[in-house]
Amino acid sequence: MQTYLSTKSIEYYLKELKEIFSQIWLKPSEIEKRCEELFKRSKEFDYKRILVSGETDNTTLYVIEDSSKIHVFSPNRDLRENPLLMRWHPSWYEIESKEIYYKCFLSCEELYEHLELPTVTLVNLCVIENFPIPRLNLSTGTLSSYLRKEQLAKVELIDMQVGTTINQIIKNLLDSQPDIIGLSVNFGQKKLAFEILDLIYSHIENGDLSSIITVGNVIPSFSPEQFFERYPSLLICDKEGEYTLRDLIKMLKKELKLDEVNGISYVDESGEVKHNVAETVNFKEEVPTPSLDILGEISKFRGALTLETSRGCDYSRCTFCPRDHKLRSWRPLSVEQTLKQLDDILRAGKHFNIKPHIYMADEEFIGELPNGTEAQRIIDICEGLLKREEKIKFDFAARADSVYEPKRTKEWNVERLKMWHYCALAGADRIFIGVESGSNQQLKRYGKGTTSEQNIIALRLVSALGINLRIGFIMFDQLMKGLDNLKENLDFLERTDALMKPIDIGDMTYEELYDKLLNDKEFIEKHKTGKPVYTIVSYMLASMEILMNTPYSRMVQLTERKEEVNLIMNDGKPDMNMGRYATSFVDKTNGNLSEACQMWIDSNFGVMYTIKSLHKVANPREKKKLYSYMETHREISHFLLKYLVYNLSPDKESQIILSDFLRMHSMEHILDNSKINVGDGSKENILNVMTNWQLIMEKLLRDVEADLNKGIITDSEDHRLHNTLKRWFSDMGNWSLINAYELN
């Protein structure tokens, strides 16, 4: 092994490559092109090809003259840590005692073979009509970055969020002929996946394509059999995909057999479905910054930045949450890795003029660590963010008992308040808390381990620190009887003592603030915003989705046996497009209300999702305007249900509240019109009420349309808000479900 470049030349190339590699948003093909331009100006190389592998800080350039001479440059990482070189020859650097950033290898036929990397194309599916505004995709982005970091494959990403069509996907696959094709199939994407897979397999049968095909994410892992019936040679990733793709590459190289591939399901030669054991991915050590190839295109559609800083959920007892396809243990990135990945994404976002606001995709951002050190971990991350010159914003999700847990000591809760204050100082903009219900009966059925009053206090503590809130709320569940749970939920959502104005705590200790927010009614009254809780509900009027493999699905089955009723429809077979069961309600009237409210949600979903997505990337003035639309929509939705419940169970207080709301919208005649009445709670009567209530929603959206036309708010480059508004107005009075149950 010898060096054929002068020290001066090596330093020059490392400096130039460092500058190119610092542009971490470039696709590998774009990096290779820039490297080729660099070396074309040089007379020191007569190379056959250039290969770029690695990601962010371990990107490596291989300049291949022929099998007898290969130059390797790694300006940011010591080559002694290079995974490809270590696979080739683990002791290649034994005689070297110093860090190595350049090496010329001679007579290296075996290394030459290692540089013949397999090709992998990963496709992120998306139904744009339902989710018009994109975000940095993590499912394929993280898998890609892992393969690149380990220098296992050349990876190309395709993302349907940015308008890529099925025909374009197929053309790309036929042109590039990848060794492995992977599809990420989320809720509601089964039909789209089948459409693409049908075309892929038709080309395989015709001899136009010879790739290994694998699919992953929620829907295939819930029920692989439905995919195998249609595509017997398909390989399904059951859980995390990093090690599965690693092993598929090894299988491609004949280093592993199919039954040795991590976490894969497949049909063996006898026709039996096999499930290989899945090893847990070392998330803390092995998963780098997601690939940022698509970020430039995402920015054109005013998309948002996302990041996952942990995986899993230690609680894992919510009855509606399936855990089989996820792992129960909570595994966070280290503080250093979290800050590094945040910096990578923010730097790339800045290049594309995406505002420095990151939406954390963690199931539970706070989590639990041995010896209760999770709060200190968050404080350390926040201290790191506070050292940044450029301030950022970030959103994340947490459990209510990560904020306030009455079963814990006062010291524990005060320490949590300190942690949340650090989050506020570091840029926490909005926290999603899975409140889910204001009814203690429902909370028990949901397995939340919290109470309605505990949830109120949690919201109070966080909002007092100036952090905005968003909550999950499951209004309806199939086992609720009568209207009591609904009334409790409506009362909870109308409470105005949960959301606080930001409080200056400069003159207070954390303990003093904690005591006041729990026990001082006068202090609470003075500092509350007066806004009701329904203004922060993420999706109003939502119903329980009974997903496969959940405790709640087993609760329904137990109720069927105990009460001798049939609740799960379709002969007990699930709707595989959404991985859920079509289930009747124990109480038929509640079932009618639930279905109608879901139609209300779906009728507004496209336009409200677009508004919410634009809100994420808007400037402060537009952000305020867009959020006002969201609040008004939530209020209209809340009072729709209140009116429906009032019709079924009238009371004087509700009549007064409804009268005030309707008068504000010049619709007070509804209360006195016997034709606009739920009557016996039939679906027809409920939809009749909703059609009239939709006139209130139309007024809101006409205001949105006017503001858009005046330039008060800004649309995406391809006018997605304009298009969703146009679609909404044309569909007025038509009630249907976006993802209706697939019944066989």
From Swiss-Prot:
Molecular function terms, GO-annotated: 4 iron, 4 sulfur cluster binding; cobalamin binding; isomerase activity; metal ion binding
Stated name of the protein: 4'-phospho-dehydrooxetanocin synthase
Keywords: 4Fe-4S, Cobalamin, Cobalt, Iron, Iron-sulfur, Isomerase, Metal-binding, Plasmid, S-adenosyl-L-methionine
Entry note: cofactor: Binds 1 [4Fe-4S] cluster. The cluster is coordinated with 3 cysteines and an exchangeable S-adenosyl-L-methionine.
Catalytic activity: dAMP + S-adenosyl-L-methionine = 4'-phospho-dehydrooxetanocin + 5'-deoxyadenosine + L-methionine + H(+); AH2 + 2 S-adenosyl-L-methionine = 2 5'-deoxyadenosin-5'-yl radical + 2 L-methionine + A + 2 H(+); 2 5'-deoxyadenosin-5'-yl radical + 2 dAMP + A = 2 4'-phospho-dehydrooxetanocin + 2 5'-deoxyadenosine + AH2
Catalytic class of the enzyme: isomerase
Role this protein plays: Isomerase involved in the biosynthesis of oxetanocin A (OXT-A), a nucleoside analog with antitumor, antiviral and antibacterial properties. Catalyzes an oxidative ring contraction of dAMP, forming an oxetane aldehyde. In addition, shows methyltransferase activity in vitro and is able to catalyze the radical mediated, stereoselective C2'-methylation of dAMP to form methylated 2'-dAMP. Also catalyzes the demethylation of S-adenosyl-L-methionine (SAM) to S-adenosyl-L-homocysteine (SAH).
Pfam families linked to this entry: Radical_SAM
Residue intervals of the B12-binding domain: 119-259
Domain notes: Contains four domains: an N-terminal domain of unknown function, a Rossmann fold that houses cobalamin, a partial triose phosphate isomerase barrel AdoMet radical domain and a C-terminal helix bundle.
Residues the entry annotates as binding [4Fe-4S] cluster: C313, C318, C321
